[in-house]
From Swiss-Prot:
Pfam families: Insulin. The keyword Hydrolase does not apply. The modification Pyrrolidone carboxylic acid is found at residue 26. The lineage of its organism: Eukaryota, Metazoa, Spiralia, Lophotrochozoa, Mollusca. One of its GO terms (molecular function) is hormone activity. This is Molluscan insulin-related peptide 7. InterPro entries: Insulin-like, Insulin-like_sf, Insulin-rel_pep, Insulin_CS. Belongs to the insulin family. Heterodimer of a B chain and an A chain linked by two disulfide bonds.
Amino acid sequence: MNASVESCLTFTFVLVALCVGLTIGQQVNTCTMFSRQHPRGLCGNRLARAHANLCFLLRNTYPDIFPRKRSVDNTFEKVYSIPLSVLAELDLSDDDWGAYVSKKDIPYRSETNGLSGANFESSAFDKQLELPAMKSTTSQLFRILKLRGSRLKREVMAEPSLVCDCCYNECSVRKLATYC
């Protein structure tokens, strides 16, 4: 009987240790209405510009891969090595963006070459993405509206958001790319 109690306690201890290890290993940012900007976070216009520029670069650099996948892999290292501060300062949405991209190099860090540059073809910028048609029933729409109006969702954001991840917490280029 003593051996079964010891084995049960050992099993419980191992199970608890594994659960704690998994919990610590997952980084989940939570934000409340009292959250403040992280010292190294991007907020407001800088966050919007960095997001727009990164998504623009990823869609046009990898048109066959990026629009179909939300997950990211190692093929995007060149774009991911561009610092967020550079992405926040670029304005790729100007009317003369084609001339800007074809004449200027966007600086990025390469492991082999150090600071370098990349040119992107302007023909890829002409492609338009088609939005999928939304098919919703009335009950689904009511459920969405009910969730949007709930006080609980305002107080603690249950799902991660761009502002929570990149303004109230420190953000990486990889994290920002998951919102493209």
